[in-house]
């Protein structure tokens, strides 16, 4: 069986952190019931929060021995938050890194009941040390034209059927990324850069020759908001796509700002 560390960075996510953690715990319970998980820890980091995120996380995890909530006002980037949480979890669990998996998600994301189990099964079946899944939006919050543009961006990064079975898409989401701990440590973990720590980690694994699965079969549901918490995160990416369409609210706001008064 496998040890699992689930990493959940959270910044002012009081409205969504409860659903995120309930989903993570249910998925861990299901994986345990199927004999896939021996021990686990859920590492939540309340990063520079000014709302009730920390309190709500503690309330959801009360009575769950695997639940741990840390308060962090020092880390400069979400990459640093993810990395430090991963290393805390590994230190807490102990045991060989080759038998421990790090699963990363976000505090505005809902994972399914099979999430943990599917990752571990697919990793074993495909003989890989990292699994990059997909993230579906709960609701598009931009314009109709922006929604079409986003769909086109998604489709452009999907690989055709019948190609490399390990490389089914070119997307990377910190909300749905798993890495075996020995491989994670081998490449230095999540970078502490301003953004793009998920892509950088996957690129480092590939460059080091570690086998990686980019699968369409494992997906989570994440917020479709256009204003997020992390610089360079998904919300900023969505807003940029929406802003490029001529009839979007973002484009209208930009035109208004550029209009002389």
Residue ranges and their predicted role:
Residues 195-201:
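Acidic donor-binding loop at a coil-to-helix junction in glycosyltransferase catalytic cores
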Residues 13-34, 55-56:
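Short, well-formed alpha-helical segments that are part of the catalytic scaffolds
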Residues 14, 43-55:
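A conserved acidic beta->alpha catalytic loop
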Residues 52, 98-99, 105-121:
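Acidic donor-binding/catalytic loop of UDP-sugar-dependent glycosyltransferases
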Residues 33-48, 71-74:
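Short beta-strand/loop segment that forms part of the nucleotide-sugar
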Residues 54-96:
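Conserved donor nucleotide-binding strand/loop of the catalytic core
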């Amino acid at each position: 069986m496998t040890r699992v560390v689930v990493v959940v960075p959270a910044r002012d996510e009081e409205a969504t952190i409860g659903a995120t953690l309930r989903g993570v715990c249910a998925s861990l319970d299901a994986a345990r019931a199927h004999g896939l998980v021996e021990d686990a820890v859920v590492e939540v980091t309340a990063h520079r929060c000014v709302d009730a995120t920390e309190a709500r996380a503690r309330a959801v995890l009360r009575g769950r021995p695997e639940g741990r909530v840390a308060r962090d006002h020092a880390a400069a980037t979400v990459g640093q938050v993810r990395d430090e949480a991963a290393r805390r979890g590994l230190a807490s669990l102990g045991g060989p890194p080759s038998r421990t998996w790090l699963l990363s998600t976000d505090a505005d994301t809902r994972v399914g009941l099979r999430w943990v189990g599917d990752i571990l099964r697919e990793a074993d079946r495909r003989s890989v040390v990292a699994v990059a899944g997909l993230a579906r939006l709960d609701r598009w919050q931009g314009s109709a034209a922006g929604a079409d543009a986003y769909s086109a961006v998604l489709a452009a990064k999907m690989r055709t059927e019948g190609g490399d079975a390990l490389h089914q898409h070119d997307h990377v989401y910190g909300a749905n990324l798993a890495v075996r701990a020995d491989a994670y440590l081998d490449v230095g973990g999540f970078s502490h850069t301003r953004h793009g720590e998920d892509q950088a980690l996957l690129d480092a694994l590939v460059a080091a020759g570690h086998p990686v699965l980019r699968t369409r079969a494992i997906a989570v549901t994440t917020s479709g908001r256009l204003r997020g918490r992390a610089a360079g995160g998904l919300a900023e990416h969505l807003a940029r796509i929406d802003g490029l369409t001529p009839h979007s609210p973002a484009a209208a706001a930009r035109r208004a700002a550029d209009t002389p008064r």
